[in-house]
Swiss-Prot record:
Membrane topology (UniProt): Multi-pass membrane protein
Stored PANTHER family: THH1_TOM1_TOM3 DOMAIN-CONTAINING PROTEIN, TOBAMOVIRUS MULTIPLICATION PROTEIN 1-LIKE ISOFORM X1
Transmembrane segments: 40-60, 76-94, 109-129, 148-168, 173-193, 221-241, 257-277
The encoding gene: TOM3
Function in brief: Necessary for the efficient intracellular multiplication of tobamoviruses, probably being a membrane anchor promoting the formation of the replication complex.
GO CC terms of this entry: plant-type vacuole membrane
Keywords from the named record: Glycoprotein, Membrane, Transmembrane, Transmembrane helix, Vacuole
Protein name: Tobamovirus multiplication protein 3
Organism taxonomic ancestry: Eukaryota, Viridiplantae, Streptophyta, Embryophyta, Tracheophyta
Extracellular side: 1-39, 95-108, 169-172, 242-256
Length: 294
């Protein structure tokens, strides 16, 4: 038995080594292939287009259901999803043309601005949950919306300043700083979901078992918290690699597989799942937690 294992062992190791080399070779071949680059970027464009269309359809359904209400949190959330995914779809549909734009800062803006808008879109969910949580505990929510706008304003201002500095002096250190800043923003968003999603989940658990909709709302909050926390945490880690490792650079044409995996994990799948989970339309009458944005 021992001798047989000694014979099989090296053979299995050699086969694994061969498979590894083949996988690396295939990865490099796809990355170098102009045709494969275009195919994978167009796949991303189509997927983003589908998510954008779904968000728009849901926005129209909500408007038809409650036309008497203005821009509610739910409507703004779906509109921003439509906008972010629609812009991403156009960017990837014309990805090769985007790479030719000059000055180079225009490329950074087109590739990074949707990420900032994605942060704002899902920060809106954190705001909504924070309002529900504090209202349920009879705590004033007057400072939440100003805080939301202030945080987003600071994030956008800092990013715009970084873009202007990069435009003025395009050095590698500033690009790294910009990517690390966004990694920090992503970590902040992940912690926001963990804090308020977790608080709301624990609060719902304390409701009486017979409470109407308790089980469904628990699942909704639990799933969305897990999905959004994971996607922003993955984005944070990936942006750190992206900043310091050229092999993980997402802003180039010759990393199409990495782009496909990254954007699937941090934007397309999370957006699709969250839109599916939050697909329920608001009630027509007797609305208690459906507030217009003021």
């Amino acid at each position: 038995m021992g001798r047989a294992e000694m014979v099989v062992g090296p053979s299995a190791a050699a086969a694994a080594y061969h498979l590894k080399n083949e996988a690396i070779s295939w990865w490099e071949e796809v990355n170098r292939s102009r045709a494969w680059q275009d195919r994978l970027f167009h796949v991303l464009a189509i997927l983003y287009g589908i998510v954008s269309a779904v968000a728009l359809v849901q926005l129209i359904r909500i408007q038809m259901r409650v036309p008497e209400y203005g821009w509610t949190t739910q409507k703004v959330f779906h509109f921003l999803n439509f906008l972010v995914n629609g812009v991403r779809s156009l960017v990837f549909a014309f990805r090769r043309d985007v790479q030719k734009l000059h000055p180079e800062i225009v490329q950074h803006i087109l590739l990074d601005m949707p990420s900032l808008a994605f942060f704002t879109t899902y920060a809106l969910l954190v705001l909504f949950w924070a309002e529900i949580y504090y209202q349920a505990r009879a705590v004033s929510t007057d400072g939440l919306r100003p805080s939301f706008f202030t945080i987003n304003g600071v994030v956008y201002v800092i990013q715009i300043i970084l873009w202007l500095i990069i435009w003025w002096k395009p050095v590698r250190v500033l690009v790294i700083l910009s990517k690390m800043f966004f990694a920090g923003v992503s970590l902040f968003a992940a912690l926001g979901f963990l804090l308020y999603g977790g608080r709301l989940f624990l609060m719902l658990q304390r409701f009486p078992v017979e409470s109407k909709g308790r089980r469904k709302k628990l699942q909704e909050v639990g799933y969305v918290t897990t999905i959004c926390f994971s996607c922003f945490l993955i984005r944070c880690v990936m942006m750190c690699f992206n900043a310091f490792n050229k092999a993980a650079d997402l802003d180039v044409l010759d990393h199409p597989i990495l782009n496909l995996i990254y954007y699937l994990l941090v934007e397309i799948l999370p957006s699709s799942l969250v839109l599916f989970i939050l697909r329920k339309l608001p009630p027509k009458r007797g609305i208690t937690q459906y507030h217009p944005i003021r």
